[in-house]
């Protein structure tokens, strides 16, 4: 699906993971369906392996089996690492769901540091390729008096992704669907949500 027009109530899926402890081998991942950055239409979830390599497949399954799938126009994720270093392949997720994917990061990522940290895990080369495959890092100021957010995207042009991010950042510089997914995921896994996505 080619995203050309970004309506104010564009159906967006925001995804983030919850808390997991050192003894946990699985982590909760929550998706929140919103109309723009205003109304919640639904919630979905899955689990992924801590420091595994299953996040792309698990999120694709979660999206494709959802009753909300026909309405969705774009997927927003909180970065490309979930449950430690379970690295999301945004290009593969785009291919498997047919939806544009925008991975949002609060601070400019240090790709070299991420790649270096991966050397402590199994299947290092596979993880490294996924990180590099995410493509160039872009930026956008979603709120006038706040710092920019950074993003990588698949299946959507950066200029269109910027419009999506501005439309969905209604109360914070991060898109509201990601923030709500974070609140739900941490609230469920910690018993109370943390304030910062």
From Swiss-Prot:
Entry similarity comment: Belongs to the UPF0215 family.
Q: Which NCBIfam families does the protein's record reference?
A: PRK00766.1 (NF001977)
Q: Which HAMAP family match?
A: UPF0215
Specify the protein name. Answer: UPF0215 protein MK0057
């Amino acid at each position: 699906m080619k995203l050309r027009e970004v309506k104010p109530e564009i159906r967006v899926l925001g995804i983030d993971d919850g808390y997991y402890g050192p003894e946990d081998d699985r982590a909760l991942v929550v998706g929140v369906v919103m109309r723009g950055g205003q109304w919640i239409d639904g919630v979905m979830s899955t689990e992924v392996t801590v420091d595994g390599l299953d996040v792309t497949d698990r999120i694709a399954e979660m999206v494709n089996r959802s009753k909300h799938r026909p309405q969705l126009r774009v997927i927003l994720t909180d970065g490309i690492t979930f449950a430690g270093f379970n690295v999301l392949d945004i290009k593969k997720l785009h291919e498997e769901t047919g939806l544009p994917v925008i991975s949002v990061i609060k601070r400019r990522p240090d790709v070299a540091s991420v790649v270096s940290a991966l050397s402590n895990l199994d299947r290092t080369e596979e993880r490294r390729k996924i990180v590099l495959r995410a493509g160039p890092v872009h930026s956008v100021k979603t709120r006038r008096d706040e710092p920019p957010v950074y993003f990588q995207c698949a299946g959507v042009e950066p200029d269109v992704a910027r419009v999506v991010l501005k439309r969905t950042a209604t109360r914070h510089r991060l898109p509201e669907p990601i923030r709500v997914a974070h609140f739900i995921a941490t609230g469920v896994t910690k018993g109370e949500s943390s304030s910062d996505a």
